[in-house]
């Protein structure tokens, strides 16, 4: 009977260690992926330089937001020389919500319950996201970069 209990304990211990190892590997994979598509900007990160500023307001867990982050990752190597991307999570962060409210007021937009993603490229607004918007996003980045001297910089956002 003692041998049976010892064998059961050893099997349960081995099974538990295997589950922990698999869980750890999965978490490491998720963390690696999220590092590639996760942005946690602060208002103090915002720079006003020779690039177009892009402000992305998102909600943690929003699938459309995640798809938009993935899209920005896919164009980063070719287009990031044209823009600074600042992303603010607004569902769980009240301070970031105030930043979104600032832009909503500037663009005279009314969105309910922090509708996300809410994207601003230079002085143009995009509400929501689907892959059908991809070319429009690239065209807007290029156009705003070419005309960046004529775009309001919203530097007063730093006073929030």
Where are these regions (language model features)?
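Thiol-based oxidoreductase modules, predominantly thioredoxin-like and allied folds used
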Residues: 81-99
């Amino acid at each position: 009977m003692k041998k049976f209990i010892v064998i059961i304990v050893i099997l349960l211990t081995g099974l538990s260690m295997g589950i922990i190892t698999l869980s750890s590997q999965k978490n490491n994979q998720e963390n690696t992926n999220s590092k590639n598509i996760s942005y946690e900007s602060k208002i103090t990160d915002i720079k006003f330089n020779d690039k177009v500023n892009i402000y992305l307001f998102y909600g943690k867990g929003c699938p459309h937001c995640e798809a938009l982050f993935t899209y920005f990752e896919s164009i980063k190597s070719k287009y990031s020389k044209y823009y600074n991307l600042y992303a603010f999570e607004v569902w769980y962060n009240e301070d970031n919500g105030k930043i979104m409210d600032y832009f909503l007021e500037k663009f005279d937009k009314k969105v309910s319950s922090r509708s996300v993603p809410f994207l601003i490229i230079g002085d143009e607004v995009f509400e929501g996201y689907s892959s059908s918007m991809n070319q429009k996003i690239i065209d807007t980045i290029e156009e705003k970069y070419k005309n960046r001297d004529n775009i309001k910089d919203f530097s007063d956002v730093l006073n929030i």
